Amino acid sequence: MSETLKRLSAVIESRKPANGGDPDKSYVARLFSKGDDAILKKIGEEATELVMAAKDARAGADKSKVLYECADLWFHSAVLLAQFDLTPQDVVNELARREGISGIEEKAARKAD
């Protein structure tokens, strides 16, 4: 996992209320204090903004907005992971587990579980 993601994960973890995160001083601590629904709402908003940026880029707009919105989505996804005591490394591990497996086969295996 990249050093940037490791640092980001550590900062997000430090913003949890149990670790002294102050909702009056930290956006992430505020999200944690508001709970799952606030975090999920932000992810929905960021996902929609990413979709719109991609559509705009396909129509000729600045594709850097795709990058910005994707970064926002990744960031808020990292907050959600931390909310469930998971990390970006857990996602990397899952991707590594799936490596070399057909997407169709992998999805079928999940349905069988």
Curated annotation (Swiss-Prot):
GO BP terms in the entry: L-histidine biosynthetic process
EC number of this enzyme: 3.6.1.31
Gene Ontology molecular function: ATP binding; phosphoribosyl-ATP diphosphatase activity
Location in or out of the cell: Cytoplasm
A GO cellular-component term linked to this record: cytoplasm
Pathway participation: Amino-acid biosynthesis; L-histidine biosynthesis; L-histidine from 5-phospho-alpha-D-ribose 1-diphosphate: step 2/9
Top-rank EC class of the record's enzyme: hydrolase
Main location: cytoplasm
Family: Belongs to the PRA-PH family.
NCBIfam families in alphabetical order: histidine_hisI (TIGR03188), PRK00400.1-3 (NF001611)
Cross-referenced HAMAP family: HisE
Protein name listed in UniProt: Phosphoribosyl-ATP pyrophosphatase
